[in-house]
Amino acid sequence: MKVSIVGITGYSGLELVKILNNHKKVELVSIHATKEVGRRLSDVYPYLAGVCDLKIEDFDAQEIIEKADLVFFATPSGVASSLAEEFVQADFPIIDLSGDHRLPADVYQEWYKKSPAKKMILNKFTYALSEYTDVKGKKFIANPGCYATATELALIPLVAAGLIETDSIIVDAKSGLTGAGKALSESSHFVNVHDNYMTYKLNHHQHIPEIVQTLQAFDADMPEIQFSTSLLPVNRGIMATVYCKLKKDVAVSDIASAFAKAYDDKPFVRVQENLPELHNVIGSNFTDIGFAYNEKTNVMTVISVIDNLLKGASGQAVQNLNLMQGWDETEGLHMTPSYL
């Protein structure tokens, strides 16, 4: 299968290159960006020498349609919403890593403060959390966000089984700096990040409606959640710490059973007896989940950790590609966590 990447110079685009280089069924045939056009990717990023020596090209939908069988959009929000339309009209498969096709138009505009894609385009896309969405044969995939992935995988088994008081959910999520993308900003300046810890977009992060929308598919009465996001002084990784109260007569063994039922046959979710750590998933497509119960307060704490650039972006995108095509779900994704 031949694929193209739009948004090649961003963190997620570069991670896609590394993954696809090890994918037995995929050939990367073109790469596109607005920067460094005409230069070989390996000249811009020498660590990719011998991995990807393709030249970066301007975006040209027709050229991609002629060359490839599928396109990945690894672009900032607000880009794919306009560029994807030509592909949809041509019935040409898309996996969009941005948030442009995850939400209804009015919700997207409210939370992203940008013009949404047309409703007829949005209706074509399937929101694809790999462990829960049947995407075989689908053509248009909205890849979940990084915070959303970690949080949803932690909560869906408990919400679906009716084990927790959904109005008690509090999520304290923390991300490495790559989650903010490459755009220059005061908050990502080295002197503001190094040896620091800061909360941002409190109650206003754009992944909040995505998470609630997904959970409501498992409990129609699911209310809004309290959700905070903070920046960690690390390059990559997300830790979502979820607090919730158990319903009456629910035992800790019921929680363990719910996670086992949900994930025992899922190759990229590891439910652990110990509490997860970022180092154990960095460089991989794994999600590690652990939990602990406080009998005095009736509060269950669930911790979910992922690599924000892999399971939270490019890794899950390739996982979805594999599922779309009916291939082995793990193809191209046999990355051992780097740990250090």
UniProtKB/Swiss-Prot annotation:
Keyword annotations of the record: Amino-acid biosynthesis, Arginine biosynthesis, Cytoplasm, NADP, Oxidoreductase
Record: active site: 146
UniProt xrefs under Pfam families: Semialdhyde_dh, Semialdhyde_dhC_1
The reaction(s) this protein catalyses: N-acetyl-L-glutamate 5-semialdehyde + phosphate + NADP(+) = N-acetyl-L-glutamyl 5-phosphate + NADPH + H(+)
UniProt keyword annotation of Oxidoreductase present: yes
SUPFAM superfamilies xrefs: Glyceraldehyde-3-phosphate dehydrogenase-like, C-terminal domain (SSF55347), NAD(P)-binding Rossmann-fold domains (SSF51735)
Record InterPro entries: AGPR_AS (IPR023013), AGPR_type-1 (IPR000706), NAD(P)-bd_dom_sf (IPR036291), NAGSA_dehydrogenase (IPR050085), Semialdehyde_DH_NAD-bd (IPR000534)
Single Gene Ontology MF annotation: NAD binding
The protein's name: N-acetyl-gamma-glutamyl-phosphate reductase
Organism: Streptococcus thermophilus (strain ATCC BAA-250 / LMG 18311)
